[in-house]
């Protein structure tokens, strides 16, 4: 039976100094011997998805104490990708994932904590904490801050825009048909509450996937930040983590540990949910990195196989203007998606979770479309938006009159009525992406699933934006944005502004954008990212020239540069003779912190996970 890790600092004559310091934090003799639970909060006033988390660590801590544990809270950093977007700040977004993972590891191991509650929410915070949890492998429960309500506005002439979000504002900003007054109205209405942005963007996608993989409670992915029902998730997380700690340290039950939960089967289930719900392409990056920490062998080819067999059951903003996270919740949330996949035989029902002995047991209680959902499930998924601008969590007691259980035309469809027979994410291969590239097919009109056009090559996101706004980009172009990968950026920027500006200029359905960088979860259209190898690693994307023909075939999973092997070899030799794989004419300050990240960054095809072996020695 494993001893409490915290005994290292709380027991023995030689630890008198450590105990003295623990006492200075408020601990007493009675606390030495209880499991110490690290509460990793991510409160910050910079991020709407985290602005309401200030007091929620105390809520968890109170529940931990009532259950017989001792909670100690600390904070991590949290970058707002939307505010960091479109300028040099975006270089820091993906690297912050590694800093968050490291900071959680540092705090937990430095203080010998026994268990962990991760209070996360937005884009890189949930993934960073997930990497840490799998690395530490101590009893852990995730609870996120919850989704933002969708916006609404009345613009000129009384025209109502009933559903708005951040992307609406970005696209409207470059649409010449939108007046300054209307733009101001949209801007002020797009993000009405605290919480992670209201669509199936990266933050909400990842919070849904912690639920699918089994490390958070039912409803974690879809319950709104403003919903009173969300409060119980924080309280239950505190109770549950103490129970998990007792099972491990007192009963030697290793089944409660993150790596025992996030098994290969659990990862396959999570990827099935991901492609079924049309999650952000960033989820592929983050789950691949998490698999590395979990010691699970998952490749892009595996994900591609899942995407070919699992249909798209759910289209939420930005893939649809009809549905937002509040609608996913009303339709039963992640348990409903899992249930539809389970009934179609597309899931492994055996993996257990932090709260249930198996996925099947989980669904028996929490799938509102199943034969006998629990009263708790029915109550939870009735939680509705408040419709009031606020940054207060749990402020809405509104309830939907009915649940959306329409499997034919509702927010979450059955396999028989799927949006498409294949999933909402796809992996493409070809001479332009030998190791793979990722596209969110749920956000691409089927008329664009095959596309052929001349390349317009730019060496940075900034140049791409300039090309769009100055009219260099024409209908039919395939925009190639290169040297924006994990090393080449460095930091693998998101291309939300280029995709939003294409949409705003009416070019979204008429162009394609291909990059070795990333796309925001808010991006839609024919946006192909994570091209691997990246340009800075000698990938074929470095050899593309203006006017080269690019062929995209999503059904065939193909991404090709229509240039002969002989010509490509000639171009490669010339490029290497000229000094190698570096952007031309780009001036970009790169700090020491970013250089350190670049030195250890691996390919997007392996989740851009760090490899210290790249440092040598």
UniProtKB/Swiss-Prot annotation:
Pathway the protein takes part in: Amino-acid biosynthesis; L-isoleucine biosynthesis; L-isoleucine from 2-oxobutanoate: step 3/4; Amino-acid biosynthesis; L-valine biosynthesis; L-valine from pyruvate: step 3/4
EC number, UniProt record: 4.2.1.9
Active site: 520
One GO BP: isoleucine biosynthetic process
Keyword Transcription: no
Modified residues (N6-carboxylysine): 124
Annotated binding of Mg(2+), by residue: 81, 123-124, 494
Keyword Iron-sulfur appears in the UniProt entry: yes
Keywords, alphabetical: 2Fe-2S, Amino-acid biosynthesis, Branched-chain amino acid biosynthesis, Iron, Iron-sulfur, Lyase, Magnesium, Metal-binding
Molecular function GO labels: 2 iron, 2 sulfur cluster binding; dihydroxy-acid dehydratase activity; magnesium ion binding
Cofactor: [2Fe-2S] cluster; Mg(2+)
Cofactor: binding details: Binds 1 [2Fe-2S] cluster per subunit. This cluster acts as a Lewis acid cofactor.
Catalytic reaction(s) noted: (2R)-2,3-dihydroxy-3-methylbutanoate = 3-methyl-2-oxobutanoate + H2O; (2R,3R)-2,3-dihydroxy-3-methylpentanoate = (S)-3-methyl-2-oxopentanoate + H2O
Pfam families, alphabetized: ILV_EDD_C, ILVD_EDD_N
Source taxon at top rank: Bacteria
Binding, [2Fe-2S] cluster: 122, 197
GO (cellular component) term, any one: cytosol
HAMAP family documented for this protein: IlvD (MF_00012)
Function: Functions in the biosynthesis of branched-chain amino acids. Catalyzes the dehydration of (2R,3R)-2,3-dihydroxy-3-methylpentanoate (2,3-dihydroxy-3-methylvalerate) into 2-oxo-3-methylpentanoate (2-oxo-3-methylvalerate) and of (2R)-2,3-dihydroxy-3-methylbutanoate (2,3-dihydroxyisovalerate) into 2-oxo-3-methylbutanoate (2-oxoisovalerate), the penultimate precursor to L-isoleucine and L-valine, respectively.
Subunit structure and binding partners: Homodimer.
Family: Belongs to the IlvD/Edd family.
Name of the molecule in the record: Dihydroxy-acid dehydratase
Provenance organism: Frankia casuarinae (strain DSM 45818 / CECT 9043 / HFP020203 / CcI3)
Encoding gene (name): ilvD
